[in-house]
């Protein structure tokens, strides 16, 4: 038979150990919740950066398109001036400008095609990243709810102990 005093001390020691474990867990849970929030924020920022880069590609493509339109307008002006000129030197100079502008247009259109391909890939990447982000946010929401529920349970256990 165990002495009643020793038995009471063992029960007290068990409660103290339980209280210490619950207190440690209760202190850890807010950090775990914050870590979930931080991960959601980091993934959201990464997604936003991908969207921004994709939008920038489209903006660059539109700028090139405007440059092409500008060059085409310049070619039309040069051709109009060419019809009005009477000197061979002026005609040749305008012809050279037209050829130069046409080469620039070809280079710009090549760049525009590359940007269109990059934009299409960017849109696909954004769509995929959005699906992944939404799935992660849903998973994180459940994990956070579980952690908060666990924190409430630990608090209740701590009060009961």
Q: Locations of the language-model features?
A:
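Long amphipathic alpha-helical coiled-coil segments
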Residues: 73-74, 108-133
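Short coil/loop "hinge" linkers that interrupt or connect long alpha-helical coiled-coils or helical hairpins
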Residues: 4-7, 11, 62-100
């Amino acid at each position: 038979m165990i002495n009643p005093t020793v038995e009471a001390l063992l029960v007290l020691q068990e409660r103290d150990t339980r209280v210490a474990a619950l207190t440690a867990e209760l202190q850890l849970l807010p950090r775990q919740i914050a870590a979930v929030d931080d991960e959601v924020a980091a993934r959201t920022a990464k997604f936003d950066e991908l969207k921004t880069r994709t939008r920038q590609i489209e903006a660059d493509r539109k700028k090139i398109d405007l440059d092409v339109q500008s060059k085409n307008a310049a070619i039309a002006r040069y051709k109009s001036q060419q019809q009005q000129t009477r000197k061979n030197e002026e005609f040749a100079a305008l012809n050279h400008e037209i050829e130069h502008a046409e080469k620039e247009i070809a280079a710009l259109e090549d760049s525009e095609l590359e940007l269109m391909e990059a934009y299409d890939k960017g849109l696909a990447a954004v769509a995929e990243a959005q699906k992944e982000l939404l799935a992660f946010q849903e998973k994180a929401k459940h994990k956070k709810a579980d952690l908060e529920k666990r924190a409430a349970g630990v608090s209740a256990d701590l009060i009961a102990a």
